[in-house]
C-alpha cells in the first residue's frame, strides 16, 4: 500500500509539472517574436551608442507587452471568461510605455463585461500588431475600447498609415471566437482607410 501511495503521489506531481511545462511552452510561443526583438536590441547596443536611450525605451515597450500578454494567458488558462478590466489594464500599461518611447498616446474605454478568454487575447494581440507595424512612422495613437454584453469594439486611430495590414486579420480565430461574443475590430487610418472585421 505504501508503494502504491508513493507511486500515485509521484504521478500527481508529474501531472502538475507536465501541466506547468505545457503552459510555459504555450506562453513562450505567444511572446516569442517580442522576446526575440528584446534579445536583438540588447545584443546590438551599448551605453555609448547615440541611440542607446531610444532603443532601451523600445525594449521596455516590448517587455510591457510580454508581461501583460503572459499575464492574460495565465488568467485565461484558469477561466473561460475574463473581466474586460484585464484588457483595460493591459492596454493602459502598454500605452504608458508607448508614451515613454516618445509617441503621444491616449486611451478611452467604456463599459465592463465578461470576455470569452480567446477574444480578450485576440484583441490585445491586434492592438499590439497595430502599434508594432506603425512604430517607425506614427507620432500619435488613440485607442478606444467599448465593452458591452455580446459586443466588444476596439478602435486604433493613428496619424499615419500602416505600411501593410492584412484585411483578413486572424479571420479564422475571430470566427472561432464568436460563439459567445460578437466582436468588431476596426482600425481607422487617414485618409479614411478602414479595416473592419465583424
Model regions and ranges:
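Alpha-helical/coil-rich non-catalytic "connector" segments in signaling and regulatory proteins
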Residues: 1, 146-147, 198
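Short beta-strand/loop element within the Bergerat-fold HATPase_c
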Residues: 142-158
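Glycine-rich acidic phosphate-binding loop
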Residues: 156-164, 188-190
Amino acid at each position: 500500500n505504501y508503494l502504491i501511495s508513493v507511486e500515485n503521489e509521484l504521478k500527481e506531481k508529474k501531472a502538475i509539472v507536465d501541466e506547468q511545462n505545457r503552459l510555459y511552452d504555450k506562453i513562450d510561443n505567444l511572446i516569442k517574436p517580442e522576446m526575440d526583438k528584446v534579445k536583438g536590441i540588447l545584443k546590438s547596443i551599448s551605453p555609448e551608442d547615440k541611440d542607446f536611450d531610444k532603443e532601451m525605451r523600445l525594449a521596455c515597450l516590448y517587455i510591457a507587452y510580454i508581461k501583460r500578454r503572459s499575464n492574460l494567458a495565465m488568467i485565461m488558462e484558469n477561466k473561460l471568461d475574463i473581466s474586460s478590466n484585464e484588457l483595460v489594464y493591459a492596454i493602459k500599461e502598454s500605452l504608458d510605455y508607448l508614451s515613454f518611447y516618445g509617441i503621444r498616446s491616449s486611451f478611452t474605454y467604456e463599459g465592463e463585461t465578461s470576455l470569452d478568454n480567446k477574444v480578450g487575447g485576440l484583441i490585445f494581440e491586434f492592438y499590439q500588431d497595430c502599434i508594432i507595424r506603425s512604430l517607425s512612422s506614427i507620432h500619435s495613437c488613440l485607442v478606444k475600447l467599448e465593452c458591452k454584453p455580446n459586443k466588444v469594439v476596439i478602435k486604433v486611430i493613428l496619424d499615419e498609415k500602416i505600411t501593410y495590414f492584412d484585411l483578413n486579420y486572424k479571420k479564422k480565430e475571430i470566427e472561432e471566437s464568436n460563439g459567445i461574443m460578437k466582436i468588431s475590430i476596426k482600425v481607422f487610418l487617414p485618409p479614411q482607410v478602414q479595416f473592419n472585421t465583424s
